[in-house]
Amino acid sequence: MSRPKKIGAEAALARLPTWAKAEGGRDAICKTFRFKDFNAAFGFMTRVAIRADQLDHHPEWFNVYNRVEVTLATHDADGVTELDMTLAGFMDEISGN
Protein backbone atom coordinates (compact mmCIF):
# COMPACT_ATOMS: atom_id res chain seq x y z
CA MET A 1 0.00 0.00 0.00
CA SER A 2 1.37 3.43 -0.91
CA ARG A 3 1.87 6.14 1.64
CA PRO A 4 -1.14 8.50 1.81
CA LYS A 5 -0.54 12.06 0.63
CA LYS A 6 -0.80 14.78 3.26
CA ILE A 7 -3.46 17.40 2.50
CA GLY A 8 -3.42 19.25 5.83
CA ALA A 9 -6.09 20.11 8.38
CA GLU A 10 -7.08 23.40 6.73
CA ALA A 11 -7.91 21.72 3.41
CA ALA A 12 -9.85 19.00 5.22
CA LEU A 13 -11.83 21.49 7.30
CA ALA A 14 -12.95 23.31 4.16
CA ARG A 15 -14.83 20.10 3.30
CA LEU A 16 -15.72 19.08 6.87
CA PRO A 17 -17.29 22.20 8.44
CA THR A 18 -18.41 20.46 11.66
CA TRP A 19 -14.85 19.37 12.50
CA ALA A 20 -12.12 21.52 14.09
CA LYS A 21 -8.34 21.76 13.97
CA ALA A 22 -6.72 19.87 16.83
CA GLU A 23 -5.02 21.96 19.50
CA GLY A 24 -1.31 22.03 20.19
CA GLY A 25 -0.12 22.85 16.70
CA ARG A 26 -0.63 19.31 15.47
CA ASP A 27 -1.86 18.75 11.91
CA ALA A 28 -5.00 16.83 12.89
CA ILE A 29 -8.77 17.29 12.95
CA CYS A 30 -11.11 16.61 15.86
CA LYS A 31 -14.77 16.42 16.77
CA THR A 32 -16.89 15.51 19.79
CA PHE A 33 -19.93 13.35 19.12
CA ARG A 34 -22.77 13.16 21.66
CA PHE A 35 -25.36 10.41 21.76
CA LYS A 36 -28.53 9.53 23.68
CA ASP A 37 -26.69 7.17 26.02
CA PHE A 38 -23.66 4.92 26.41
CA ASN A 39 -25.18 2.15 24.29
CA ALA A 40 -25.61 4.52 21.33
CA ALA A 41 -22.07 5.86 21.77
CA PHE A 42 -20.63 2.35 21.93
CA GLY A 43 -22.65 1.29 18.88
CA PHE A 44 -21.17 4.24 16.97
CA MET A 45 -17.67 3.23 18.05
CA THR A 46 -18.28 -0.35 16.96
CA ARG A 47 -19.40 0.70 13.48
CA VAL A 48 -16.43 3.06 13.16
CA ALA A 49 -14.05 0.31 14.31
CA ILE A 50 -15.27 -2.01 11.56
CA ARG A 51 -14.87 0.69 8.89
CA ALA A 52 -11.48 1.73 10.28
CA ASP A 53 -10.23 -1.84 9.96
CA GLN A 54 -11.46 -1.95 6.36
CA LEU A 55 -9.51 1.25 5.65
CA ASP A 56 -6.54 0.13 7.78
CA HIS A 57 -6.76 3.56 9.37
CA HIS A 58 -7.63 3.96 13.03
CA PRO A 59 -8.85 6.95 15.04
CA GLU A 60 -7.59 8.30 18.32
CA TRP A 61 -10.63 8.49 20.54
CA PHE A 62 -11.87 8.87 24.08
CA ASN A 63 -15.27 7.81 25.38
CA VAL A 64 -17.14 8.77 28.54
CA TYR A 65 -20.79 7.73 28.79
CA ASN A 66 -22.57 9.32 25.80
CA ARG A 67 -19.62 11.34 24.49
CA VAL A 68 -16.98 10.22 21.97
CA GLU A 69 -14.07 12.58 21.31
CA VAL A 70 -12.24 11.80 18.06
CA THR A 71 -8.93 13.02 16.65
CA LEU A 72 -7.85 12.03 13.15
CA ALA A 73 -4.43 12.26 11.54
CA THR A 74 -2.35 9.87 9.47
CA HIS A 75 0.79 9.00 11.41
CA ASP A 76 2.72 7.87 8.31
CA ALA A 77 2.11 11.27 6.68
CA ASP A 78 2.49 13.28 9.90
CA GLY A 79 -0.81 15.03 9.24
CA VAL A 80 -4.26 14.90 7.70
CA THR A 81 -4.78 12.85 4.52
CA GLU A 82 -7.69 11.67 2.38
CA LEU A 83 -7.93 8.64 4.70
CA ASP A 84 -8.86 10.99 7.53
CA MET A 85 -11.42 12.72 5.34
CA THR A 86 -12.95 9.36 4.40
CA LEU A 87 -13.21 8.21 8.00
CA ALA A 88 -14.52 11.59 9.20
CA GLY A 89 -17.19 11.56 6.51
CA PHE A 90 -18.25 8.06 7.53
CA MET A 91 -18.47 9.12 11.18
CA ASP A 92 -20.61 12.12 10.28
CA GLU A 93 -22.86 9.95 8.12
CA ILE A 94 -23.59 7.34 10.78
CA SER A 95 -23.63 9.58 13.85
CA GLY A 96 -26.96 11.27 13.24
CA ASN A 97 -25.38 14.45 14.67
UniProtKB/Swiss-Prot annotation:
Q: Which reaction does it catalyse?
A: (4aS,6R)-4a-hydroxy-L-erythro-5,6,7,8-tetrahydrobiopterin = (6R)-L-erythro-6,7-dihydrobiopterin + H2O
Q: What is its EC number?
A: 4.2.1.96
Keywords for this protein: Lyase
One GO-annotated biological process of the protein: tetrahydrobiopterin biosynthetic process
CDD domains the UniProt entry points to? PCD_DCoH_subfamily_b
Reading the lineage from the top rank, the first entry is Bacteria
- On whether Acetylation is a keyword of this UniProt record, the answer is no
Q: Which residues form a coiled coil?
A: none
Q: Which GO terms describe its molecular function?
A: 4-alpha-hydroxytetrahydrobiopterin dehydratase activity
**Family in the record:** Belongs to the pterin-4-alpha-carbinolamine dehydratase family.
State what protein this is by name. Answer: Putative pterin-4-alpha-carbinolamine dehydratase
Q: Which organism is it from?
A: Phenylobacterium zucineum (strain HLK1)
